[in-house]
Amino acid sequence: MTKFQEWPDEPIDLLCGGTPCQSFSVAGLRKGLDDPRGNLMLTFGAIGAKYRPKWLVWENVPGVLSSNGGRDFGTFLGMLGQLGYGFAYRVLDAQYFGVPQRRRRVFVVGCLGDWRSAAAVLFEQESFKGDSSARWGSRTVHPCLTAKGARAFDDRTGYVLEEQGIRTTTPLEHERLMGFPDGYTLLPGKRSPDTPRFHALGNSWCVPVVRWIGERIEQVNRILESR
């Protein structure tokens, strides 16, 4: 990433990437931009300055919002603004995209010269209406006591136990937690130890979340091109 000046000068439509989260995570030392890994956030912006794509997508942990009192994140957004990008950001949680894990991440979407289009990607019109509880069917009841609702089954997930306690998860289960196809981190014809597979999946993006963002960009871009 730091060698981007050596990359070919080819036009691109979308720059998509994330930078190391350890500098911003509340579980780390939180050195922010003082950490070389955290400073890669600005390198991402420099890549945008070189290629000037129409769209940018950047990701990190929610801790980036409060790192150094929010000044680190503000520096990044200010850089995008100076480059001519309108932008929007939102915290998205993978559990609401069809995978069984809570994984909250900050996503920044930038659109060259147009913040409204960037916001339209991350914020659907329906999202401003809030969520309401599902309605029960209408019914006429006698004005007296009615029985409380009850379940005839236990819908809680059971524990998976081994002889010595709760077992560890497998790379296959991690692939499914992240929305990858089964065996995606296996290298055909090569030995694939579990540890590198865990690291790769832990540093990756949740597939359904990225797919949703990509589809939203496609929809908004189609509208822009039709004008």
Regions from the PLM with identified roles:
Residues 3-14, 21-168:
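Class I S-adenosyl-L-methionine
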Residues 128-227:
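C-terminal target-recognition/interaction regions appended to catalytic cores
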Residues 14-16, 179:
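Short, hydrophobic/glycine-enriched beta-strand segments
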Residues 20-22, 182-183:
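Short connector loops/turns at beta-strand edges and beta->alpha or beta->beta junctions
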